[in-house]
């Protein structure tokens, strides 16, 4: 009876995490739609202002302002800088490539984090997980199809997204593990506005009302998704949370088809199955070994989450 009750207790967090990741994908689709007319930096700038709305409401509701005191601003600066770059390269990739292909690239992040944890955090990753990493990289290559006729040079720009996202996570993991979630989401958004605003000064283009509304909605989606995913990560077992992240691939296929008429190729299907299998294997191995490298990552926030 207790086991059944325990499983039921995870259902709200499970569905909220799925909703959060679907909001992330919806945000990506909106960005892809409006990026035809505006610079990516301007989209990030406007998006981040609106993302502050749910973030501020969340912080106010939980009385998190006092937890901003004593924050390590150096950690926040470099973490936010690398994450701003990751978002820039992600949005650029979503605009220039099919959504499912870009998600194949985004989901290289956990694999790169695992490699980075060995190089920079002195984590021990044995041959089984390294084998999974190799399979994941092979899956990404299959999905991207670098030897096909439709390969685009922008793929190499998009590949900078998982590299920067992994760097952001590793910075936090090494130097900022004691920082509060509130300091990450508040300082992260403020610094994102500053970084993107520097470029917007020189390239701002007046948005029409409909595009401004869409960009604002994408920002609210993003801020809300961060909160949902972070809270789910704090309460769900790592194996469950680490598996949910892959719903983004399915949501990306769905929205890519419905909104943009993108039809996944056989390479996309095969490659993403391999990527998901490799990622899930790493998650399961970490749970068995009681490690916490990949299972604590949350897309975009990229924060090692502390359990309650």
Describe the role of every protein-language-model region.
Residues 1-22, 52-78, 127, 177-182, ...:
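Membrane-interface interhelical linkers
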Residues 1-42, 149-174, 294-308:
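Glycine-/small-residue-enriched transmembrane alpha-helix faces in small-molecule transporters
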Residues 9-13, 68-72, 140, 145-167, ...:
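Juxtamembrane helix-entry segments on the extracytoplasmic side of multipass membrane proteins
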Residues 21-26, 56, 80, 84-88, ...:
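Hydrophobic/small/kink-forming positions within alpha-helical transmembrane segments
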Residues 37, 93-96, 122-124, 178, ...:
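Helix-loop interface residues and adjacent transmembrane-helix termini in multi-pass membrane transporters
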Residues 92, 109-131, 250-269:
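C-terminal transmembrane-helix exit sites in multi-pass transporters
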Residues 102-108, 175-191, 226-257:
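Helix-helix packing/entry segments at the starts of transmembrane helices
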Residues 128-145, 267-286:
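Hydrophobic transmembrane alpha-helices of multi-pass small-molecule transport proteins
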């Amino acid at each position: 009876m207790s086991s059944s009750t325990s499983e039921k207790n995870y259902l709200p967090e499970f569905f909220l995490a799925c909703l959060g990741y679907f909001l992330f994908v919806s945000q990506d689709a909106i960005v892809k739609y409006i990026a035809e007319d505006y610079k990516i930096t301007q989209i990030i700038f406007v998006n981040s202002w609106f993302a502050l709305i749910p973030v501020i409401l969340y912080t106010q509701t939980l009385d998190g302002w006092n937890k901003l005191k004593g924050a390590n601003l150096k950690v926040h600066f470099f973490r936010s800088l690398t994450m701003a770059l990751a978002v820039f390269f992600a949005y650029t990739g979503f605009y220039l490539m099919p959504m499912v292909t870009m998600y194949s690239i985004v989901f290289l992040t956990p694999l790169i984090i695992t490699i980075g944890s060995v190089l920079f955090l002195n984590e021990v990753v044995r041959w089984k997980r390294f084998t999974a990493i190799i399979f994941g990289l092979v899956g990404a290559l299959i999905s991207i199809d670098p030897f096909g006729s439709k390969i685009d040079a922008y793929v190499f720009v998009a590949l900078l997204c998982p590299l920067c996202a992994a760097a952001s996570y590793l910075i936090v993991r090494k130097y900022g593990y004691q920082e509060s979630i509130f300091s990450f989401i508040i300082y992260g958004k403020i610094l994102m506005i500053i970084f993107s605003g520097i470029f917007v000064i020189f390239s701002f283009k007046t948005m029409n009302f409909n595009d401004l509304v869409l960009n604002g909605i994408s920002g609210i989606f993003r801020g809300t998704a961060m909160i949902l995913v972070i809270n789910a990560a704090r309460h769900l077992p790592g194996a469950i949370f680490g598996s949910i992240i892959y719903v983004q691939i399915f949501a990306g296929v769905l929205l890519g088809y419905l909104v943009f008429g993108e039809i996944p190729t056989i390479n996309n299907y095969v490659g993403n199955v391999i990527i998901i299998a490799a990622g899930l294997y790493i998650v399961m191995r970490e749970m068995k070994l009681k490690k916490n490298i990949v299972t604590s990552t949350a897309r975009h926030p990229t924060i090692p989450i502390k359990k309650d």
